[in-house]
Amino acid sequence: PLVIAGPCSAETEDQVLQTARELANLGKVDLFRAGIWKPRTRPNSFEGVGKEGLAWLRRVKEETGLKTTTEVAKTEHVYEALKHGVDVLWLGARTTVNPFSVQEVADAIAGVDVPVLIKNPINPDLKLWIGAIERIYKAGINRIGVIHRGFSYYGDTKYRNVPRWQIPIELKRQFPDLQ
């Protein structure tokens, strides 16, 4: 398995570097993740530190040797992340639900040799997930992985995001080479 770890949100340089050092010392983490841009449901919530946090990810690579990843949702994010040496890009659940957003990212990475991870959409819609994968693949990206985070559910549940395992199982059946 590929172990991805790090803070959901990059809040300070110290937080990012301290977390990365501790994870690197474990020797079990393959990819350091930190959210630089955070799409929030409502305005006036913390939406990430923005591109200044990308310099922190560069320092993580330099100081720990860990490869880095962050979520991108639009062209500017892609260009800034690549300019700062981010190793792997990921599409978040809120981006995956919007074919226009996925296409914008796909156009921005066309011709770039970078791995892309694609989270399942927020709602349990296999076709949306497949559509995102196909758009990224058609942009010339061959190293695609998927992240199953579970799905939103309106009601009582013991999980924040309900797994609905039949959906990722069907995805793997249709795309057996996906990681």
Task: Walk through the language-model features, giving the residues of each.
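Conserved, mostly hydrophobic/aromatic
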Residues: 6, 32, 81, 118
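Catalytic beta/alpha-barrel core
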Residues: 45-49, 66-78, 87-101, 114-126, ...
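Charged helix-capping and loop-helix junction motifs
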Residues: 47-55, 160-167
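Catalytic cores of alpha/beta
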Residues: 13-21, 75-85, 126-133
